[in-house]
Amino acid sequence: MAASVTRVLKGAGGRQLLLMVARRRPVLMQPFLLMPRKFWVSSALRSEDQRQPPFSASSTHAETQGHAEEQYQQKQPPPRYTDQAGEESEGYESEEQLQQQILSAALQFVPDFGWSADAIAEGAKSLDMSAAAAGMFEDGGSELILHFVTQCNLQLTELLEKEQKLVQLGTSEKKPTAQFLRDAVEARLRMHIPYIEHWPQALGMLLLPRNIPSSLKLLTAMVDDIWHYAGDQSTDVSWYTRRAVLTGIYNTTELVMLQDSSPDFEDTWKFLENRISEAMTMGDSVKQVASTGEAVIQGLMGAAVTLKNLTGLNQRR
């Protein structure tokens, strides 16, 4: 059955079909997707046993090297930045912290400047820094988008964890799986609303070859988190099919949202509800798995055409 899934999904390009990357995955993973990235915030909250990697000499060496680098960094003076008056100031523990602050501040300027270095420069100025601080980002627009997606995924994880704790405390009823999935995807997509006019630009940039590994890792981590908090503990082929299906639902709903002019995106949420309902009635037979793969492929092809038409245009009329 796993071979059938692999043959069906192998031929299509796009970020859904590399869904194999996730923290609690079975062993058939693509190793090149596990490379760390500077701005990543882990969105999966697991037990220590689940997080613990297997012991190896290389991991021991990495830990030793990391400890040495940490000691070196502790000896260095704190980074300086230049404010708008041209004076140098200190106030951030690390360059990474400074970059995170600038990117977060830049988000409020995306509606006016798009996902661009200009938005980052305005964000720096809002923190009383020189606009030249935007120069510390090699690919400003892409880094701003990836920062935003990372923060959205983190917010979703915090929301799902809070709901889980309420259920564990007995103060809230456990939702049926279909409702849980629908609410989780809707909550995540609603985070795009303040930036919806510029989201076609964001999707186009996320699909650039240099950004695909990062955007895929964020997407698969988000989907895996949703299934984790939904209570999925499968270890067979259904682990893959469930994540493939939810990824397809998320991406197609995201595209529907870009063209939805109904009040509060009502048509989008109705579309999402219908897709979730259909997915929950699907079994794990070989024929149904194949149908799922074909649907994902068709969704990818449709997404590529739609994005080509949407990118850079004002879609919501």
Swiss-Prot record:
List the Gene Ontology MF annotations in alphabetical order.
isoprenoid binding; lipid binding; protein homodimerization activity
Query: Which Pfam families does this UniProt record tie to the protein?
Result: COQ9 (PF08511), COQ9_N (PF21392)
Q: Where in the cell is it found?
A: Mitochondrion
Q: Where are the transmembrane segments?
A: none
Q: How is this protein named in the record?
A: Ubiquinone biosynthesis protein COQ9-A, mitochondrial
Give the matching NCBIfam families: diverge_rpsU
Biased composition (Polar residues) is annotated at 53-63
Q: Please list the residues that make up the transit peptide in this record.
A: 1-46
Report the pathway entry.
Cofactor biosynthesis; ubiquinone biosynthesis
Q: Which domain of life is it from?
A: Eukaryota
Q: Which residues make up the binding site for a 1,2-diacylglycero-3-phosphoethanolamine?
A: 243
